């Protein structure tokens, strides 16, 4: 019994070391510009920009295939930060991709929900929990407010509630000029 346990532990150590070596040896380097652009985007994964998520949109911006003003959840502040990062001229938010709205979170009226799971399938960040023919609910901290769960609901039990500003959620609304150290 003890020898079998030692053999299993040795196998686990060898496989762990092999995986660690492979992760270092075969690392795929990403484009640092794409990572910087992606860090500025709001990570709502809403698709309002015409791309399936924030990372593909960041790649398109870096490759020059998309404009910097297509992200309504990022708002004017996001466009300003992207313009500063890329050295481009600021453009107002594109109206064809939507308008900037205050941050909102989805809520499900649990008395009306029929448990069809359509909202579960539509949520890009898995912020909705529930099972078939069971009540569903939204995990507030995970919800990005993308509104993709609202349209598929057959009984209209999902509504968007604006997030009230608290000490934890308040953000400075005005452009911030970064002060750089003199060389």
From Swiss-Prot:
Enzyme Commission code: 7.-.-.-
Cofactor(s) the protein requires to work: [4Fe-4S] cluster
Main location as per UniProt: membrane
Keyword annotations from UniProtKB, A to Z: 4Fe-4S, Cell inner membrane, Cell membrane, Electron transport, Iron, Iron-sulfur, Membrane, Metal-binding, Repeat, Translocase, Transport
Cellular localisation: Cell inner membrane
Entry annotated with the keyword Transport: yes
Residue ranges constituting the 4Fe-4S domain according to the UniProt record: 29-88
Record text on cofactor binding: Binds 3 [4Fe-4S] clusters.
Subunit structure: The complex is composed of six subunits: RnfA, RnfB, RnfC, RnfD, RnfE and RnfG.
Annotated family: Belongs to the 4Fe4S bacterial-type ferredoxin family. RnfB subfamily.
Task of the protein: Part of a membrane-bound complex that couples electron transfer with translocation of ions across the membrane.
Name used for this protein in its record: Ion-translocating oxidoreductase complex subunit B
